[in-house]
């Protein structure tokens, strides 16, 4: 997941300092004893989980805290600190959070600054080895486990099988962005094309960043290019109204689309594998806004997933998002925190929360529970995409007011992209 948030200017000097410090104190390796069981009953752990929210933990987070508490005897509280806040807490050597869960784009910063606890654990090492390679690439620091993956997701263009039959579209025919937009805009049938324009733009922007910016050390990052402005104008040239979220030309937004999850009405839509819970053709009293998803397997039986279109022929991989857990190097409960991570690693889907229950973590198909429907074509579609996926390894902390002003007509395309470039340059050179 790529999180972009305005960085308070008063905090910038501290954030920059973080990139050159060693973490404030030596990080000792933690080894969980396998020879003697330790009773952690009564221990309280604070987990920074941005989806679970502040205490008490909700069911929307990365982990199933209720089940973890039952099985470990540990009480969990959760907190929500965003990127800038997390960095400041680590810089201040704060010990109140025991486990942080962060986006993959944040990991390189924490790794280079030494803000992690090295882990020695056969259980976690075996777990990481079983995950997709794209996850293991960010798990190790100086040959020690430092960051444990807890989520992996990839977005796709979702197309009903019936629409594929009608249009004879194939992944190859809409492999590139312009071809995809042409397919949608020239379609003259009764189906409606849906998308989530902001999320689609983020995925295309990730392609651009992965393709051109392998690191930010040279402080030379350029968004004022015809290629980037083409993405910007094609995807973001829409306005929102009081009663409806806008969408890219030729589309309706899938959050307001009455039939975006209906294989009989949609031409295409946008989503990840977790979208499965929201797809059904069943409507209550033919009301398009009231649909019955309970027990529906329509997603697995009636839909296929095509890769997000490429912005150019130079793009050779799919853009994915992930989240990693790490033990706060300043935590006073490192052993208990490691025990929790080992518990999760021993049976991932048992302890996965709502935000990660559909994560395709593993390279072995037999590792997935029944609700993944691994024999379905759409599972194979997503699974194959992840075999050739890359994660964004940095994040530009910008508020993206440029997009708001562009869509409001306050800035031209050139002015909007120049404003974003200005924000990026400030971040690079502080």
Region annotations inferred by a language model:
Residues 15-16:
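Hydrophobic core
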Residues 353-405:
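Long, aromatic- and glycine/proline-rich binding clefts that accommodate carbohydrate-like moieties
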Residues 288-360, 401:
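Extracytoplasmic/periplasmic substrate-recognition and gating elements
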Residues 70-131, 167-168, 260, 267-268, ...:
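Extracytoplasmic "Venus flytrap"/periplasmic binding protein-like
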Residues 5-9, 19-108, 335, 351-353, ...:
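Conserved N-terminal structural module of periplasmic/extracytoplasmic solute-binding proteins
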Residues 218-254:
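Glycine-centered hinge/linker elements that transmit conformational signals in sensory
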Residues 146-150, 155, 178-224, 229-230:
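Extracytoplasmic/periplasmic solute-binding protein
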């Amino acid at each position: 997941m790529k999180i972009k948030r305005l960085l308070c200017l008063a905090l910038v000097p501290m954030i920059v300092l973080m990139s050159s410090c060693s973490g404030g104190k030596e990080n000792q390796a933690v080894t969980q004893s396998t020879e003697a069981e330790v009773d952690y009953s009564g221990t309280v752990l604070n987990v920074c989980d941005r989806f679970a929210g502040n205490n008490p933990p909700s069911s929307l987070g990365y982990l199933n805290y209720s089940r973890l508490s039952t099985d470990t005897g540990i009480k969990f509280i959760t907190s929500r600190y965003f990127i800038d806040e997390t960095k400041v807490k680590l810089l201040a050597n704060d010990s109140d959070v025991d486990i942080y869960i962060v986006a993959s784009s944040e990991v390189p910063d924490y790794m280079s600054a030494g803000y992690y606890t090295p882990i020695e654990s056969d259980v976690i090492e075996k777990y990481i080895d079983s995950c997709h390679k794209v996850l293991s690439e960010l798990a190790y620091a100086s040959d020690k486990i430092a960051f444990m993956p807890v989520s992996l997701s990839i977005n796709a263009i979702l197309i009903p099988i019936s629409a594929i039959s009608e249009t004879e579209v194939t992944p190859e025919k809409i492999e590139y962005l312009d071809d995809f937009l042409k397919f949608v805009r020239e379609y003259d049938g009764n189906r409606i094309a849906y998308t989530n324009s902001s999320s689609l733009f983020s995925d295309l922007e990730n392609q651009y960043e992965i393709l051109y910016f392998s690191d930010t050390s040279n402080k030379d990052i350029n968004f004022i290019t015809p290629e980037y402005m083409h993405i910007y104008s094609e995807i973001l040239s829409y306005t929102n109204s009081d009663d409806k979220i806008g969408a890219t030309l030729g589309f309706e937004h899938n959050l307001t689309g009455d039939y975006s999850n209906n294989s009989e009405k949609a031409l295409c839509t946008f989503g990840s594998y977790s979208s499965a819970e929201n797809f059904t053709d069943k409507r209550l009293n033919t009301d398009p806004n009231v649909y019955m998803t309970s027990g529906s397997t329509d997603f697995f039986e009636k839909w296929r997933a095509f890769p997000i279109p490429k912005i150019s022929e130079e793009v050779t991989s799919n853009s994915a998002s992930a989240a990693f857990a790490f033990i706060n190097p300043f935590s006073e409960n490192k052993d208990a925190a490691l025990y929790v991570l080992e518990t999760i690693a021993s049976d991932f889907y048992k302890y996965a929360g709502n935000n990660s229950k559909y994560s395709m973590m593993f390279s072995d198909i037999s590792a997935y529970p029944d609700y993944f429907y691994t024999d379905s074509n759409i599972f194979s579609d997503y699974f194959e995409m992840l075999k050739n996926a890359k994660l964004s390894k940095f994040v530009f902390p910008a508020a993206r007011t440029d997009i708001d002003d562009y869509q409001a007509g306050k800035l031209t395309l050139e002015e909007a992209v120049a404003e974003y470039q200005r924000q990026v340059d400030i971040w690079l050179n502080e």
